[in-house]
Amino acid sequence: MNTSIPYQQNPYNPRGSSNVIQCYRCGDTCKGEVVRVHNNHFHIRCFTCQVCGCGLAQSGFFFKNQEYICTQDYQQLYGTRCDSCRDFITGEVISALGRTYHPKCFVCSLCRKPFPIGDKVTFSGKECVCQTCSQSMASSKPIKIRGPSHCAGCKEEIKHGQSLLALDKQWHVSCFKCQTCSVILTGEYISKDGVPYCESDYHAQFGIKCETCDRYISGRVLEAGGKHYHPTCARCVRCHQMFTEGEEMYLTGSEVWHPICKQAARAEKKLKHRRTSETSISPPGSSIGSPNRVICAKVDNEILNYKDLAALPKVKSIYEVQRPDLISYEPHSRYMSDEMLERCGYGESLGTLSPYSQDIYENLDLRQRRASSPGYIDSPTYSRQGMSPTFSRSPHHYYRSGPESGRSSPYHSQLDVRSSTPTSYQAPKHFHIPAGDSNIYRKPPIYKRHGDLSTATKSKTSEDISQTSKYSPIYSPDPYYASESEYWTYHGSPKVPRARRFSSGGEEDDFDRSMHKLQSGIGRLILKEEMKARSSSYADPWTPPRSSTSSREALHTAGYEMSLNGSPRSHYLADSDPLISKSASLPAYRRNGLHRTPSADLFHYDSMNAVNWGMREYKIYPYELLLVTTRGRNRLPKDVDRTRLERHLSQEEFYQVFGMTISEFDRLALWKRNELKKQARLF
């Protein structure tokens, strides 16, 4: 009797037979070795992992969701890691406080011993401590054991739902609000004394504003001098760069500076103040060193220009003009040119003009000759100082180069017509300005006739005339070197070498004739004052009155100085010249358009020596004694020329200070020399 065995259909092979064992995976008939798992049979080749396909017949496996999976794939998909060693747990597992451990990993964090069965476990954060170790722990605060939490806002227990951890407290999400406006804080917040605030309410009550942008500061703040700035708003007012952390900064009012920028600004301010003080009494448009600038002086707290200052008596202008070596200048070319030309018409040479006035004169003379003479050619043959070509036919002007000044000074004299070579060139008559009623000095110059032999011999000796006729019409003497015919040597007193230049014999006659031509009583009075001042002897303000008979050296101006390169100088014996008795008491014709102070103009006569008319020996001093301090020049030696401090340096020290020789220095323009002297603190 056959009994039927109940058959369960294979899901892989629904067709089945009760007499044949079929594979659970592929459904084919199983022959030979088979694997039986839970009453299911498999071919050995068919019993593989459902994920990676590896064979499971010789290794362990897991069955989950009707799938056979190897150990590695099961751990990656469904495995549990140990909370201590972070490895997958297979076999026994210990769960405590929602965490799982290997039995060997569940030990005390302090003594590293396994927990006894049934013992209490103290959990503090990430550490599990046994009861023995928890009692021996020294702590000022009791260890919080995880348990029921209370909201810091409503003080109720947080039983379920999401909690918020802020300010080291737990809150209900709906309880974490701004203390002022009660807005739920879901984003950024600012706390003060453990109380949360929204950003706007915190700034309104406790906020700090930036001094630059006037906005509230959130985050990093830069504090300096009790003021607060955003790090990006605190910038140097000079270089506009931000300050790095810990960098030093200067605070001036509402401005911040880098230390280097502050020092540079102070230096620029001093330089600007210095330039402003020099041009404080000059009108707009004038510039320092310009050839069109005229000396202005301060007398009795009043600013006087050249025109007004020239009308003062010389004694008043000498002793009451304040600091003539530092007074400013202003352009007044119209009056300057007229008065200077009139002074030349009265017989004075440009050696009497100041360095600034001579520059104006030379530029004016150059423009007049260009405009009046169509045959004038501006070529390198002619000197840059405005010296016209020397022709023997020109009886009105010829130029005598200064000893060392680097520029040519016109010397007015009358030449003998018969000693000149005939030529077609006729020099134009210069310096003729029509007279005006407003200025008593505007009188036309007195020109002598060409054929007047007597007047020609008065103004120039025959040797001088013969020497000047040696120059060819296309060659002019070098303005930087003096010709040998202009000086006569002598053996004078052994004390101090003295020298003088011959003056034109007709100058005093011209002055007398101009005196008679003046119809105005004021003009005659002013000219008498000048004649009286010229005929009087001035006292040296730097020498005591009792030493008036001692030998004194006259202070020197820009035109004539002692040679340093050995060029010949004129020496004349006082006892052998009858003209000295007549003119020794008069001040020399020096280069001074204004009546400057005695520091630059007074010349003295000593009966034991010859008269010094524009030449002197400079006493050598160290460079440190000649430096000009900020509080004035009261510390300088008394016998120095304050307008030419560089002349008191030795040749070696002069080269060290200026980087050039004295002759090279004299060839520079006046403004350039003054700038170099300012840089060397000798001005």
UniProtKB/Swiss-Prot annotation:
Span of domain HP: 615-683
Region (Disordered): 372-472
Positions of post-translational Phosphothreonine modification: 543
One Pfam short name: LIM
Tissue: Expressed predominantly in heart and brain.
Modification sites for N-acetylmethionine: 1
Residues recorded as bearing Omega-N-methylarginine in the entry: 631
Residue(s) carrying Phosphotyrosine: 376
SUPFAM superfamilies the UniProt entry points to: Glucocorticoid receptor-like (DNA-binding domain) (SSF57716), VHP, Villin headpiece domain (SSF47050)
Polar residues: bias regions: 380-393, 406-426, 454-471
Gene Ontology molecular-function annotations: actin filament binding; metal ion binding
Any one GO biological process: cytoskeleton organization
Compartments reported by the entry: Cytoplasm
Phosphoserine PTM sites in chain numbering: 277, 280, 282, 286, 290, 337, 372-373, 379, 388, 493, 503-504, 567, 576, 607
Major subcellular site: cytoplasm
Keywords per UniProt: Acetylation, Cytoplasm, LIM domain, Metal-binding, Methylation, Phosphoprotein, Repeat, Zinc
Residue span(s) of domain LIM zinc-binding: 21-80, 80-140, 149-208, 208-268
SMART domains reported in the protein's UniProt record: LIM, VHP
Top-rank lineage group of the source organism: Eukaryota
One Gene Ontology CC term in the entry: stress fiber
Listed PANTHER family: ACTIN-BINDING LIM PROTEIN, ACTIN-BINDING LIM PROTEIN 3
Assembly notes: Directly interacts with F-actin and ABRA.
Protein function: May act as scaffold protein. May stimulate ABRA activity and ABRA-dependent SRF transcriptional activity.
Protein name: Actin-binding LIM protein 3
Species annotation: Homo sapiens (Human)
